[in-house]
Amino acid sequence: MSGSTITPWVVGNWKMNPMRANANQLIEEFKQLLQQNQIADENCHVGVAPVSIALTTVQAQLQDAARTVHTVAQDVSRVAGTGAYTGEVSAELLKDSQINFVLVGHSERRDIFGDNVEILKAKLQNALNAGMTVIYCVGESLEQREQGQAEQVVLQQICDIAPVVTAEQWQNQVVIAYEPIWAIGTGKTASPQDAQAMHAKIREGLCQLTPAGSNIAILYGGSVKAENAVELAACPDINGALVGGASLKAASFYQIVQAFAQSK
């Protein structure tokens, strides 16, 4: 079942970038583009995910933008509430700072920092229970893809979290981001046809898990650029993009937002 009626999302994941002065300039340039060429909120949800120490600064800087731009945390603690957990930032602390969106399960968190299924389930559950919207990332490695395991791996990653997500949370608080790991930061990208095929399988799997399956946005996160955004946006089950490097340049990020806003 197609998700073509879903309002698309475009989220810029800045990762561990940039320095403060460059971040300020990036935000101001993006705001200028939004002012000159306004995109209605109802045509596309837009978010940026800066480093944790910049969340509230970026949020404040975006308040006078010509449209809503959400501030998204790149990660959240597996521990809820407050307490003696040095270096951690809980979902409750994020919400207390009016940060309502968070990435969970990004491949870099899984591969570099060892976020396994149990850790990710705890992070997801804490964020959802705190009232946050979670962009949950799934994806396969090149080896898994070459062995014909891509669909199985991705669908299992979604099934793994099902026990901690309620029907209401599926409906209102969950966005899925498919990121083929082999296409992140490599300049490679799945063809739009390949991306759509995987998104259609994810849609099918979501519909089997929850009645809300046909209404959940599924974002593509495999080296999305201004040059391929229009073609990706035309795919019926690609409901937006999780953008990495291209989100660090205001013009390219704006072009991606524009492509998805005009496509649905």
Curated annotation (Swiss-Prot):
It catalyses: D-glyceraldehyde 3-phosphate = dihydroxyacetone phosphate. Keywords: Cytoplasm, Gluconeogenesis, Glycolysis, Isomerase. It is an enzyme of class 5 (isomerase). The keyword Cytoplasm applies. SUPFAM superfamilies: Triosephosphate isomerase (TIM). Substrate binds at residues 13-15, 185, 223, 244-245. It is found in: Cytoplasm. Its main location: cytoplasm. The keyword Cytoplasm applies. Pfam families: TIM. One of its GO terms (molecular function) is triose-phosphate isomerase activity. GO terms for cellular component: cytosol. NCBIfam families: tim (TIGR00419). This is Triosephosphate isomerase. It comes from Acinetobacter baumannii (strain AYE).
